[in-house]
Amino acid sequence: MKKILILGSTGSIGTNALELIRNNREQYQVVGISGNKNIDLLKKQIEEFKPISIYVGSEQDAIYLKKEYSFIKEVYFGENGLAELSKNSDYDIILTAVSGAIGIDATVEAIKRGKRIALANKETMVSAGVYINKLLKEYPKAEIVPVDSEHSALFQSLQGFKKENLKKLIITASGGTFRGKDLAYLENVTVEQALKHPNWSMGKKITIDSSTLVNKGLEVIEAHELFNVDYDDIEVVIHPQSVIHSMVEYVDGSIIAQMGVANMKTPILYAFTYPEKEYNSSINFLDLIKNNNLTFEEADRKVLKGIDLAYRAGRTGDTMPTVFNASNEIAVELFMKKQIKFLDIYRIIEEAMNSHQVLTLNTDNALNVIKEVDREIRKKVREQWEK
């Protein structure tokens, strides 16, 4: 039986993971979960799966839950709580499904313990990829299996081939909510419009990121760090049907693609079972006859600038990807609060990147540098844009 620790159990990926486990309880045991503010759902999960360790955002909620459930041995909260949960819990696999830079420390602790990380937190590799890769070399028993559908597709399509056989990675994108729209249209789009993704059911933040194509930009940086592939050999292609989740082109002209329904359960399950594949009754199967029209097109990077900003951040390297990520996180938060317009998201990211003096990350102090830059950028954006 595999012991699973789920960070972000109340979010979209976390709830999908728990549904997979619910349908295969003889194979998996949930030893720990974490939620932030959705206490009602967290309580239901605690009652059903009976984890012995949990994390919650506030001290008040932590005290309440510890009193409420006698079987819980440890309750963590606060800024360092997720890392402590990762450091102290007894698990085989940790699913990092929290959004934001808070997931980095928890991943670091899991690597130091030689665990498998089912990675669904983009920021870990975007902001701290250089440091994480260095750490993985120091702790070779640890492994990262990506959960993001595109990176899972690339990971699967790369199995069994040498890196010198590779020509390029092709990351597919649905195009998001505003595919085909012009700048005049985007100037006044609402939060409600941006949250209507055509294919995927996801959390609010990642849905907004998909509408700006910043999400795809983050995926480009993450792919560079995960697979050690140059940015010139990573391509983004719009694929509106979201059936092909990504592809790998090889030097002999062949392209290997991973296909499936637009659902996060398959990549989550693969991260749990790798290198094997396992049936689960909650998985839906792709009907090729019904999905017989697969199309591809170029992304309109002049209108939806998230991809180009990411390539710029990634090629600059060092602390610039952290700036890209942190400024976007605050910009999306302000947009969802209706304090800025949709196109202001790009303006905020560009301003933050243009004004940043890049710091190198080739020292043992890299993680502290990343955290400090992350804090500074968030503070600066809030001061300039928050109403």
From Swiss-Prot:
Query: Which residues bind 1-deoxy-D-xylulose 5-phosphate per the record?
Result: K122, S149, E150, S174, H197, S210, N215, K216, E219
Keyword Manganese tagged: yes
**Any idea of its EC number?**
1.1.1.267
The Swiss-Prot or TrEMBL record annotates one GO molecular function as: NADPH binding
Its Gene Ontology biological processes? isopentenyl diphosphate biosynthetic process, methylerythritol 4-phosphate pathway involved in terpenoid biosynthetic process
The UniProt gene name for this protein comes to dxr
Catalytic activity, as annotated: 2-C-methyl-D-erythritol 4-phosphate + NADP(+) = 1-deoxy-D-xylulose 5-phosphate + NADPH + H(+)
Q: So what family is this one in?
A: Belongs to the DXR family.
Protein name, per record: 1-deoxy-D-xylulose 5-phosphate reductoisomerase
Q: Which Gene3D superfamilies match?
A: 1.10.1740.10, NAD(P)-binding Rossmann-like Domain
- Protein's job: Catalyzes the NADPH-dependent rearrangement and reduction of 1-deoxy-D-xylulose-5-phosphate (DXP) to 2-C-methyl-D-erythritol 4-phosphate (MEP).
- Record has Lipoprotein as a keyword: no
| Binding residues for NADPH | T10, G11, S12, I13, K37, N38, N121, E123, G203
Gene source species = Fusobacterium nucleatum subsp. nucleatum (strain ATCC 25586 / DSM 15643 / BCRC 10681 / CIP 101130 / JCM 8532 / KCTC 2640 / LMG 13131 / VPI 4355)
HAMAP family per record: DXP_reductoisom
* Pfam families per record: DXP_redisom_C, DXP_reductoisom, DXPR_C
Which keywords does the record carry?
A: Isoprene biosynthesis, Manganese, Metal-binding, NADP, Oxidoreductase
The residues that the entry says bind Mn(2+) are D148, E150, E219
Q: Which cofactor does it need?
A: Mg(2+); Mn(2+)
Pathway entry: Isoprenoid biosynthesis; isopentenyl diphosphate biosynthesis via DXP pathway; isopentenyl diphosphate from 1-deoxy-D-xylulose 5-phosphate: step 1/6
